[in-house]
Regions:
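Short, solvent-exposed loop/turn segments at secondary-structure junctions
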Residues: 56-57, 100-103, 137-138
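Short acidic (Asp/Glu) patches
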Residues: 65-69, 75-79, 109-117
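Nucleic-acid nuclease catalytic cores
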Residues: 118-149
Length: 194
């Protein structure tokens, strides 16, 4: 709000909105962290969020008990979001969230993540992606082998993976009344196929 000194009235400044991308996927991540805690506490599975490797460069110490990181850099590209053990099998997966209603953009899946998925599949791991289509409030689990083959076959002529493909080759994941994204029954079916 701008007010002139001689009382000529008030002029409202237009409010500008800032678009931020830092919290994309935070709802799904929070839900999965909650779900994984639920699984761990009930001795169902041990799945953890992988920390992002950073190199701290500058720290401000306003008080001894309140250090604030002022500058940090990613050490190297991270792999996937989650890993752990279930029924004696190594589990590794990525969580992806989009507002799109019909597809998931390739740009949100990084080459180093795809390479990591291939390496884990080669070693016999259970590897998948959990997609959350927030506009539709729908969750799907897609085995990484389907994601990898779709991207390899379509990278030149498509920019996204259609929701119809995810529905065809993946499985829906229910959100329970307790806010648990219950993906373990789908993982059971993946393990049983081995």
């Amino acid at each position: 709000m701008i007010q002139y000194p001689k009382g000529h009235g008030k002029i409202s400044s237009p409010q500008t909105s800032t678009v931020t991308y830092g919290s994309r996927g935070m709802f799904l991540e929070t839900l999965l962290n909650q779900t994984n805690d639920y699984y761990r506490l009930r001795k169902i599975a041990v799945i953890h969020k992988k920390p992002t490797p950073i190199q701290v460069v500058k720290v401000d110490y306003p008080k001894r008990s309140a250090a604030v990181i002022k500058e940090a850099y990613y050490r190297h590209a991270s792999t996937t979001d989650y890993n752990g053990v279930y029924r004696g099998c190594y589990i590794d997966f990525e969580a992806k969230e989009t507002k799109n209603k019909t597809s998931f953009p390739f740009i949100n899946i990084h080459e180093h993540q795809l390479q990591h998925m291939e390496e884990c599949i080669f070693q016999g791991g259970i590897v998948f992606v959990i997609f959350y289509f927030s506009s539709l409030n729908e969750y799907y689990l897609l085995e990484s082998q389907y994601l990898l083959s779709f991207i390899k076959e379509n990278k030149e002529n498509k920019k996204s993976i259609p929701l119809d493909y995810i529905k065809k080759y993946g499985e829906p994941i229910p959100l329970t009344v307790q806010s648990i994204l219950d993906y373990i029954p789908v993982v059971d079916r993946l393990i049983d196929k081995i």
